[in-house]
From Swiss-Prot:
Thanks to its abundant amphiphilic alpha-helices, it may integrate into membrane phospholipids, leading to lysis of the membrane. Its high hemolytic activity is inhibited by phospholipids, but not by cholesterol. Has antibacterial activity with a broad spectrum against various species of bacteria including both Gram-positive and Gram-negative groups. Also has high ichthyotoxic activity. Belongs to the grammistin family. Group 1 subfamily. One of its GO terms (biological process) is defense response to bacterium. GO terms for cellular component: extracellular region. Expressed by the skin glands. This is Grammistin Gs G.
Length: 24
């Protein structure tokens, strides 16, 4: 399971600023 999630971490982390920007 983690072998599938780890490659996605950069995408998830990269999307965080966009989510924050959308909330503001």
């Amino acid at each position: 399971l983690f072998g599938f999630l780890i490659p996605l971490l950069p995408h998830i982390i990269g999307a965080i600023p966009q989510v924050i920007g959308a909330i503001r």
